Regions:
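Short linear sequence motif anchored by a di-proline
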Residues: 1-206
Length: 206
């Protein structure tokens, strides 16, 4: 499960991918977490736009006021779940990031680790949205990531952003087949556990 990530200067990072940015500025967020408004790329007829959407999706059909917002959707079942099957077909988005956090469970403790691309390029998370909310798509952890956690966000290359947003392609099949970037990670301070902590020190190796 992906529940925290880092995003710095999203407007600059997506300048070659979008035509405009709406209510998004070049800021630095070292502890992006659910229920925050975060930069997401959406496709319109006249081009892509970078918008601020709330991380955590409550489907339109959910009438229970206590329904918990969904922050992740499993790639393996996204075409089957009533919450997601229409969204992966018609409402795809891409969240931009620099890296993300995962926690390794060790006996009674969980230790945070920070993941980035090995080539240092920006990270693009595949997602889905409904109105002003979005969630990230996850898959089984690959290679060394599984040492820390059994799930990971689906990450696509910048060259595949336009393809994923192309609704003529079958979204889940594309995500299963496309090339994924290599990731590296290191242990970080448990200060990241507190959502209100937000500084560059959170991503420093300990």
């Amino acid at each position: 499960m992906c529940g925290r990530y880092v995003v710095k200067n999203p407007v600059t990072k997506t300048s070659k991918l979008v035509k405009s940015a709406i209510q998004v500025e070049d800021t630095e967020n070292y502890n992006a977490h659910p229920y925050q408004k975060l930069p997401v790329i959406k496709k319109y007829k006249n081009g892509n736009t970078l918008e601020a959407l709330k991380w955590g999706l409550i489907p339109g059909w959910a009438k229970d006021k206590d329904f918990k917002a969904l922050i992740n959707a499993r790639l393996e079942t996204i075409d089957e779940k009533v919450s997601f099957k229409k969204l992966i077909k018609n409402n795809r988005c891409v969240a931009v990031a620099d890296g993300f956090y995962e926690w390794k469970r060790e006996e009674k403790e969980k230790t945070p680790h920070y993941f980035t691309r090995k080539d240092t390029n920006p990270i693009f998370f595949a997602g889905i949205y409904e109105e002003d909310q979005f969630c990230l798509i996850t898959e089984e952890a690959k290679d060394n990531i599984s040492e820390i956690h059994h799930r990971q966000p689906v990450i696509i290359n910048q060259t595949d952003v336009h393809r994923y947003l192309n609704l003529e392609l079958q979204g889940s099949a594309f995500l299963k087949e496309c090339n994924k970037p290599d990731l590296i990670f290191h242990e970080v301070s448990k200060d990241v556990n507190k959502p209100t902590n937000n500084s560059a020190s959170l991503i420093q190796k300990v």
